[in-house]
Amino acid sequence: MFLPDHRISILPSALLLLLNAALTAAQTRKTLPVNFVVSETPPIAPFYTLPTADQLAVSIALCTGSVDGPIPRFFLTNSSTTASPGPDGGDDVFEITLDRGHGSYTGPFQSGGVLAVTDVPPQMTFEIGVSDGSTIHESTSSSAIFGDTTASQALLFSPAFSRLDNPQPQYPNYTLPRAIPSIPAAPSDPKNYTLIVSPTSNGLTSMQQTACALSTQKSTGIVANESFWLRDASGWRTEWLMTGLTPKTNYTAYVILDAYKVTLPIFFTTKSSTFSCSLVSKLPYCPSISYAVPLPPPPAPAATYDNTNLPKAISDPLISALTNFTTTLTTFACGRDLYSPLVTCADCQQAYRTWLCAVSFSRCADPDTAPPLAALLPSQSPNARNAAFPSGNAFTQLLPCLETCTATDRACPSFLGFRCPVPRFNANVSYGVGYVDSGQEGEKGGGSMGMWDDAFGNVWCNSGL
């Protein structure tokens, strides 16, 4: 028997439904740890709890699906009054917009936060990264660098890391680098780069452009060598030598950094099966040279030429020329008088090195795969530029860019007497004219490319870089 003042109150059904929904949501929430990546596969939790922090970077990476297919939506709140953010909004609710599978938000979370996911397609998987520093998932603006190919090989380079600080020499100790400059030790904590190469026909560009999606694709070919190389002033790079590729095939290449960041794609084409030149790279006196030159295959077991097996008949005259040029250059009062507010003798030496290497190592091209309007010239080794190359090897030469010569002319003191041919007086006989800068009216190309190469593997003239 109940006393009159002990009555049972029945809650309204609408309130019971709200309480039940709140309890269900609380039970299905996952807590996202900081500086960690959570991989989600179906069934997907609808809500995630974010911890309290002055600032967090929340990033999303879709791991399945295509860039044109259906994608989920992600809503985020850093307000303690909004328990279930979604399309209907609420206090401080933000939608994380996805672009090619990536999306991120950075802001304060002083009261914690909630991440909601809706409209998840079947079988969709994704990653959520939370960091109190920089964004974990990212599509970077950088890309791999294409060196060159043969019929079955390719030289590729990662984006630069560990940039070197090379201060300009100052008076009175104005010493220029030697012909063979000393190479510092490689960084002890290099970036964790992974190369992915696949035939373009496999359609990697139609996938979500994220590291977790691209990593599911098996890379084509064999990484015959992976090492570090100080290719240019931008810093150290990872150099990859790929072998086992198919002749006359279009390839797409990505570089993944630290498992979660991905570069923009680049494209390249292997040469035809009759291509007879060999790759050369890793020359300390010509560090940026990384392309095919008119040499027979290197002695086994080497797959390419480098400083250890390049014939001395080729390297010694080049090193001697660099030494003599440097000696002559230092007779100018580089450390006492400023001859230019823009460049120094060190800039002159570097520009001359680039030019000398470009003209000494003729770059082979394949007429079957070269881009239209490239600066091609049928040649015979030995050629007029470097008679040290062995004879009897006919090849098609990709002429040096005229700008490689004019850059040296601009950077160097006039007393050296360095001069370049001009477009109106047959410069195109020995240089690629009108590909980077505008040539004279009517010149082939007319500067329409505005560059010596592009991300699609087209190379119009040899810059020596």
Where are these regions (language model features)?
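Fungal secretory targeting signals
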Residues: M1-Q27
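Non-catalytic, beta-strand-enriched accessory regions in extracellular/secretory proteins
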Residues: Q27-P108, G112-V114, T125-G129, H137-A185
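Solvent-exposed loop and beta-edge segments used for protein-protein assembly and interaction
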Residues: T52, F109, L245-P247, Q349-A351
